[in-house]
Each structure stands twice: as C-alpha cells, then as structure tokens.
C-alpha cells in the first residue's frame, strides 16, 4: 500500500480531531446528533469522517436493536474512535446507515490549528491576473532567448532545405 495522506475534506464550522495525535476527523457541519452513548460514555453521530480506517463488518446487539457495524480507527495513530453503521435491521434506525459514531473521549475540538487547504476560509477576493505581462515577454526575456532566422518561401521559387 502507498503512503497515506491525512487531509481536510470540505471542513466547515468547528473542526474535530483525534485526541491522541490531533489528526483532523470531521467538522461540526457533519454532526447529526450528540444524544448517543458509546462503550466509554457519551458519543456523537456524524454524517462523515475523514482520515479513518475501518475494521471488519460485525453484527452487534445495541440498545436500539441489531446493527451491522465496522470499528473506526484513526489513520495516523490507530486509536479506536468508535464505529460506522453499515446496516440497521429495524426500519426506524436506517437513518444511521453509513454514519459514524465517534466517542467523545476519543476526539477533541481543534482550535484554529488547521487551515482549509482549498482556501475557502479566505475572506478577500483573489488578485486579478496581470494579462499584459503574461502576453508579452519582458525585455530581459527577449534578449536571453535564442534568435532564429526566418525564411520566407514563395510558391514561385523552389524551396531550399
């Protein structure tokens, strides 16, 4: 397997990271509910999480019934964070499918430690390109280029090669 890259994918609002290594996991815009309980105490349900690896599918009996879940681990430090719901047996619990539970003891708020790599958190407009400079070379560039001799070929005379 190639080298793993930990990054930020469309972060909006407050950022949350692994409590052990501070790797970005998700953001507040992905939050579905804080009213969950994990094996270590309170847990939070998120729509998506990044920089995680998933364990094998298992069938588990939970407080809301049987679910098919995968454990979720931090990609950097391999800390167990929680689990992802693959499938719910009960029709009333299907809203959890493909969402991730992260236990509150395993993540923390990251306060301004990570910038948005897409630059969408910038407030000012990007500078306008200087088209005049890009179309015409500078005098110094003209002198440093090799000069080629142009030969015009007319249709009436024979062309020399």
Swiss-Prot record:
Keyword set includes Metal-binding: yes
Keyword annotations: Metal-binding, Zinc
Keyword Zinc: yes
Biased composition annotated in UniProt, kind: Low complexity: 151-161
Entry-linked InterPro entries: Yippee, Yippee/Mis18/Cereblon, Yippee_fam
Cysteines paired by S-S bonds: none
Disordered: annotated span: 117-161
Domain Yippee: start-end pairs: 14-111
GO cellular component, one term: ubiquitin ligase complex
Family note: Belongs to the yippee family.
Protein name, per record: Protein yippee-like B0546.4
């Amino acid at each position: 397997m190639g080298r793993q890259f930990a990054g930020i994918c469309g972060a909006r609002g407050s950022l949350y990271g692994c409590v052990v290594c501070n790797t970005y996991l998700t953001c507040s815009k992905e939050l579905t509910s804080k009213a969950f309980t994990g094996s270590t105490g309170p847990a939070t349900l998120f729509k998506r999480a990044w920089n995680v690896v998933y364990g094998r599918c298992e069938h588990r009996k939970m407080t809301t019934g049987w679910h098919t879940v995968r454990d979720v681990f931090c990609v950097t430090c391999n800390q167990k964070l929680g689990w992802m719901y693959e499938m719910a047996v009960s029709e009333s619990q299907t809203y959890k499918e493909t969402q991730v539970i992260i236990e509150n003891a395993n993540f923390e708020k990251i306060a301004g430690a990570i910038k948005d790599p897409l630059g969408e958190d910038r407030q000012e407009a990007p500078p306008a390109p200087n088209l005049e400079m890009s179309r015409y070379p500078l005098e110094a560039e003209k002198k440093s280029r090799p000069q080629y001799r142009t030969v015009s070929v007319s249709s009436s005379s024979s062309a020399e090669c």
